[in-house]
């Protein structure tokens, strides 16, 4: 399997600590730089969205859910790809994946290899000047 440059930065947002750690291990095995956040609020307050190449987020979280996070991200970084991992895909009814909001959806449980492929595709679609790898 091809390793990725360590300069690709992936933010992972989920209120489930075990899922955060599982995704961290998966992504670090492919040499991604991983930033973990236990809430959407924590990501938004971190100020690191501008330096992030892709966001992976749960949808159902307290205070700010994944859909509101998507809106906040795209208000400041419209081309930043967002990948949802969720047990509740029905919450996305009416939104068009891979449309102007640049998101993909994986239902929990998901296959790690499929998530890695989605991340690879997402960072390859970044404008050339935004690619770090």
Task: Go through each PLM region and give its residues.
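Non-catalytic signal-transmission and effector/linker regions of two-component phosphorelay proteins
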Residues: 1-11, 17-24, 45, 71, ...
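Acidic, metal-coordinating helix/loop segments flanking the phosphotransfer/catalytic sites
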Residues: 36-54
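Acidic catalytic/metal-coordinating carboxylates
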Residues: 38-39, 65-68
């Amino acid at each position: 399997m091809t390793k990725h440059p360590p300069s690709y930065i992936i933010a992972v947002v989920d209120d489930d600590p075990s899922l955060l750690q599982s995704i961290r291990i998966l992504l670090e095995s492919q040499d991604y730089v991983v930033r973990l956040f236990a809430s959407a609020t924590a990501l938004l307050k971190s100020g690191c969205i501008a330096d992030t190449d892709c966001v992976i987020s749960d949808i159902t979280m307290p205070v700010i859910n994944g859909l509101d996070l998507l809106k906040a991200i795209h208000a400041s970084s419209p081309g930043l790809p967002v990948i949802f991992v969720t047990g509740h895909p029905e919450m996305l009814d009416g939104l068009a994946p891979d449309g102007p909001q640049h998101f993909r959806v994986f239902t929990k449980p998901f296959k790690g290899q499929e998530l890695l492929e989605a991340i690879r595709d997402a960072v390859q679609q970044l404008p050339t000047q935004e690619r770090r790898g």
